[in-house]
Amino acid sequence: MTVAYLVAGVRTPIGRYAGALAGVRPDDLAAHVIRELVARHPSVDWARVDDVLLGCANQAGEDNRNVARMAALLGGLPEQVPGSTINRLCGSGLDALATAARAVVAGEAELVVAGGVESMSRAPFVMPKATSAYSRSAEVYDTTIGWRLVNPLMKAGWGVDSMPETAENVAAEYGVDRVAQDEFALRSQQRAAKAQADGRFAEEIVAVTVPEGRRGTRLVEVDEHPRETSLEKLAALPTPFRAGGTVTAGNSSGVNDGAVALLVASEAAVARYHLTPLARIAGAAAAGVPPRIMGVGPVPATRKLLDRLGVGLDAVDVIELNEAFAAQSVAVLRELGLPEDAEHVNPNGGAIALGHPLGASGARLALTAALELRRRGGRRALATMCIGVGQGISLMLESAA
């Protein structure tokens, strides 16, 4: 069987909402990381890339009409290289990587650029067409995150809880109190701060030049979302999503901007272009859960993947669990039998600290996991995340050494 390798990857810094990257279009963000991936690997014949697969959750604005194809062209890849955009909401970037790996394993591709992009700052407002002549009942929807243009049958059957409301549901059903959530959030911030100070993200980040003022520019070089905090500060934050709730802005992921590009290659391509793989892509799995508790999606997805691979979770050296909310992260860890402060889970912080640019996050998890696996000299790394409307997705990496 053909083996699929994650050879390399690069990402932008993650910007805050309306922050450092807000002035950059999503197609330009994605083009930027593709361009850097090409520059870092001059031995590759980029005209022989079989596909560009990028995840993107919104696609209602400047990321419309197949942002993967746009980014491939803008990023300097030859016109004959095709591109396709994948949408599994928050899991889009990880799904793009899994799809690229499957193409290689199936013998349908030797080189694939995978990844994801999201500019939540630039997500547009949308308005449906009127359903009758001279109608004055038009509604406008913010596409930054969550539901819009809801199907009444969907609402009646499964509800349309907002993402924070689903986290409140998980907290209530799995007994995750406010203290546990705030403690988890603080660890994320502390680990991210240490990782930044130690330069652990330097290899995966490419700086972005952004406009500033009328004619000026500045260089964005580090993730913008981490912030200094304390349990006292976190405990003082309001719970705006539910009366008597536990979910706050401090124990939730951010609304962010960013892009990631990864290079996936077959064994033959690795040899042909003298590449050194980061990891082997061992497999991936997705699973569905009730939409109202979408945050527990990583549990069945991970169990499904582990069962398929015939390995136990105790054989995994690094786990990157997307921290959409502390409530669901803690619930997932408990359900999987892991300590809430497990040292090998998000050792460099997670989305609560670093941010969550939806369609890019899964690819970011995989890249960070692969680099941490290499740093530790471990054998396996797992990337897993919950997905809006009730899904989870997990992907396993194995050492290429």
What are these regions (language model features)?
Residues M1-A71, G75, P82, T166-R178, ...:
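Conserved active-site "lid/cap" helical segment
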Residues M1-P26, I145-G146, V150, L231-V296, ...:
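Condensing-enzyme catalytic core mediating Claisen C-C bond formation in acyl metabolism
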Residues R11, G23, D27-H32, S43, ...:
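N-terminal extracellular/periplasmic Venus flytrap/periplasmic-binding protein-like
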Residues N64, G83-S92, N251-V255, I281, ...:
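Active-site nucleophile and cofactor-binding loops and adjacent substrate-binding regions
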Residues I86-E118, A171-R200, A261-A268, L333-R334, ...:
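Active-site-proximal alpha-helical scaffold in enzymes
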Residues L111-N169:
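Flexible glycine-/small-residue-enriched beta->alpha junction loops
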Residues E168, E204-V206, E212, A282-A353:
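Active-site pocket-lining segment
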